[in-house]
Amino acid sequence: MPHKITVEVEGELTDDSWVVDFGALKEIARSICQELHHKFLLQRDSKVLQMDEGMSNWKVRFLERGWVFPKSEVLPLPIDNTTAERLAEYIGGRIGDALKDCGATNVSAITVGVEEMPGQTGWWRSR
């Protein structure tokens, strides 16, 4: 994923006087981004694409056009569009889940920005 992401967390300070350990947060974010990197991000919840998952490939159709992608190069995501905003929402949700799994129950908000190019960033904030 060649996009730049920004992650902000808010919450109560721990006994160590931080909201989260930045090292752990960076590792979580990097791991998620690595999963997305060099993959065709398929918007599984699209209202305009028709998709068929085969044994070795994905067939995607839009109106009269169609494409076939090897499964090894596709990452199906539970989003309706691969906009920066939806990718930020997906990444933010994954970060939130991972932080909870690490015991960071003090986090009250997560904000994620996905920058497609300088000055063009889509934002998502947890509620």
Residue ranges and their predicted role:
Residues 1-127:
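Charge-rich, low-complexity N-terminal segments
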